[in-house]
Amino acid sequence: MVSSLNNLGVLLPIEGVIILVFVLSCFSLAIKRLYFSPLAKFPGPKLAALTMWYEFYYDVVKRGNYFRQIAKMHDQYGPVVRINPFELHVNDPTFYPILYSSSTKKRDKWSWAAGMFGNNTSVFSTVPHDHHRIRRAALNPLFSRTAIKQLEPTIKCQMHELSRRLDSFCESGMVLDLGLAFTVFAADVISAYCFGEPFGLLQDPDFAPEWVETVAAPSELGHLIKQFPWALGLFRLLPRSLIGVISPAIVRLYTIQEWMSLNVQSLISKRHDDHSSSAKSCVFEALLRSKLPASEKTVDRLKGEGQTLIGAGTLTTANVLKHVVFHTLDNPDRLHALAAELEAEFPDPNEDVSLDRLERLPLLTAYIKEALRLGYGVTHRLQLLADEPLHCNGMIIPPRTPVGMTSIFMHDDPTVFPNPREFDPDRWLGEVEDRRHLERCFVPFSKGTRMCLGMHLAWAEIYIVIATVFRSYSFQLHDTDRSHIEMAHDFFDPAPKLDSKGLRVTVQRK
C-alpha cells in the first residue's frame, strides 16, 4: 500500500510536467502564428490563423463548405486574407495572371494540398515546377488541339453508343438520370484514349452508378487526406472489411488505385508481347514510348497518372453537360434558338456533326461558355508558391507563401458578370472588347503552366454531345429543378446538394 502511494506521488508530478509542457508548447505556437509569422500582417480570422482545425471543420465536418467561409472573409477583410496558418487567399481578378503565370517564372505547388487524392506521382500532384514541366511536356502533345481533332472518331463512337442507350429509353418511356449517362460517356472516352479500349460503362443497364461513386470518392475524401496524409498508409494495414466500416470512401479510393495498376500493368504486358507497330496508340502507350526516364514509366507512377486523368476527364465534363442541358430545357426560348441554329447548320438530320463546324456556331459556343462559367470547372482553390515576392492590393506577399484563388469567386463577380447566377448566353455574344473583358475572368480550366491538360478534349466532347442530343432528341425535365444540378459543396469538383436526384429526364426521338 505504501509502495503504491509512493509510485502515485512520483507519477503525478511527471504527468503535471507533461501537461504543463504541452500547454506551454501550444501557447508558444499560438503566439508565433498570430504575431511572429511572416503572414501575421495579413487580415483574417484569428482562429483560422491559429489552427488548421478551422478549415477541417468547414471542409470535413460541414462537407465542402470552407469556400463560403472564405467568401465571408473577403467581404469582411478585403481581397487578400489569411485562411489558415500558412496560406493566403486572393479575390482580385487582376492578380490571377500574376499567380497563375504562363511566363518563365516558377510556380511550385503546395505539397500539403498536392497529395489530396492519395497519390503524388501524377502531373497534377507534382510539386516542383521543373519536375512538373518534364512530366507535362510528355503529355502536352497528346492533349493538344491537333491531337484532339484526330480523336474525333473516338468521341463520336462513344456518342453513337450513348445514342443507342437513349433510344432504349425512348422506347421504354422510363426516366433516366442524364447526368449519370454523361458521366459514363466521358469515362468511356477518356479510358479509350488512355488505354486503347473504353471501359464499356455505357453498356451497363444502369450506367454503372457504383463505378461513378468510386471515381468521385477521392474528390470529397481529399479534404480529409490533406489534414491527415498519414491516414491512408495506416488504413492499408487494416482488413478491407474493417476499412469499409470506418470509411467506404477510402475503400473506393484503394479500389480505383488497384484498378489503375491493373490497367497500366496490362498495357505494359501487351506492349512487351507485341513489339510491332500494330499496338494500339493511346496515352499510356505514348508515355511508354516517350523520352521520359525509366523512373517516370513505372506502374506506380503511371497508376497515379491514370487515376488523375480518368477522374479529371470524367466528372467536370459531365458537370458542364448537365448545366447546358438543364438551362436549355428550363427555358423554351433558349431551346428553340439553339435548335434553330443547329438545324440551319445541319439541315439533313442524317448528316454527321463536324467538330470544325460546331466550333463556328456562335450560339452553341455561348451556351457552352455560360455552362462552363456556372459549372466552375474545379471549385477548390489551387495553391501555388512563387520564388519571388508578389504584390497585390498594396501588400507584399512573402516568397514561398502558398497562395490560392478560386474559380467560384472569379465567375460570380458581379462587376464582370452582371447577375452572375443567371444563365445568360447573350453575355458571350456582345462586342469583341466586352467579350475580351469576360474572357480575362473566365477560368474554368485555370490558366498558366498548371492549367487543365484536358481542355481541348472537354470542349470537343461537349460540342459533339450537345449538338447530337438536341438535334436528335426531345427531353422533358422530370422532378428536377436548378438545386439538383447547381454547386452546393466544394469536393474539389463541384457537387450539388447531397440529396440531389440528378438531371432526371424523359426522352423521345424527334
UniProtKB/Swiss-Prot annotation:
The protein's Enzyme Commission number: 1.-.-.-
GO molecular function, one term: oxidoreductase activity, acting on paired donors, with incorporation or reduction of molecular oxygen
Top-level EC class: oxidoreductase
UniProt feature coiled coil, ranges: none
InterPro entries: Cyt_P450, Cyt_P450_CS, Cyt_P450_E_grp-I, Cyt_P450_sf, Cytochrome_P450_monoxygenase
Keywords: Heme, Iron, Membrane, Metal-binding, Monooxygenase, Oxidoreductase, Transmembrane, Transmembrane helix
Membrane-crossing segments per the record: 11-31
One Pfam family in the UniProt entry: p450
Record SUPFAM superfamilies: Cytochrome P450
GO cellular component: membrane
Residue numbers binding heme: 452
Membrane topology: Single-pass membrane protein
Annotated pathway: Secondary metabolite biosynthesis
Required co-factors: heme
Annotated compartments: Membrane
PROSITE patterns: CYTOCHROME_P450
Stored Gene3D superfamilies: Cytochrome P450
UniProt record similarity statement: Belongs to the cytochrome P450 family.
Entries under PANTHER family matching the protein: CYTOCHROME P450, N-ACETYLTRYPTOPHAN 6-HYDROXYLASE IVOC-RELATED
Chain's role: Tryptophan 6-hydroxylase; part of the fragmented gene cluster that mediates the biosynthesis of fusarochromene, a tryptophan-derived metabolite closely related to a group of mycotoxins including fusarochromanone. Within the pathway, fscE hydroxalates the first intermediate D-tryptophan to yield 6-hydroxytryptophan. The first step of the pathway is the epimerization of L-tryptophan to D-tryptophan in the presence of the NRPS-like tryptophan epimerase fscC. D-tryptophan is subsequently hydroxylated by the tryptophan 6-hydroxylase fscE to yield 6-hydroxytryptophan.
Name of protein: Tryptophan 6-hydroxylase fscE
Phylogenetic lineage: Eukaryota, Fungi, Dikarya, Ascomycota, Pezizomycotina
